[in-house]
Amino acid sequence: MARIARIIDEDQPNNIIGPNVRKYRLERGWSQQLLANKLELIPVYICRGSISRLEEQIRTVTDFEIAALAETLGVPIEALFARED
């Protein structure tokens, strides 16, 4: 079998939900640490530093994390994927 290599382009974002996570977090007046603490109650463990990297689109996000973020932020999953043009 041929091996497929993943090409990493450091100039490209690793997720598209980061800016919306930040937007909804700030709308609620929450710090990154508070969001991390609230996620632990589900329990989904994303530390404050990982939330920062997620919001900066540096970190990838799993489907479980996306569902937990939407639930914790009180928004539909689709809202995390909305793009502002």
Language model feature labels by segment:
Residues 63-67, 71-85:
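Short C-terminal boundary/hinge segments that cap the last helix of small helical domains
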Residues 26, 37, 71:
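Alpha-helical residues within the helix-turn-helix
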Residues 20, 31, 35, 62-65, ...:
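Residues that mark the N-terminal boundary/hinge immediately upstream of a DNA-recognition element
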Residues 2-28:
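A short, Lys/Arg-rich alpha-helix, primarily the initiator
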Residues 29-53:
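Short alpha-helical DNA-recognition segment
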Residues 26, 40-41, 56, 85:
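Residue-level detection of the helix-turn-helix DNA-binding "recognition helix"
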Residues 49, 56-68:
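Short, basic-rich loop-to-helix N-cap that marks the start of a DNA-contacting helix
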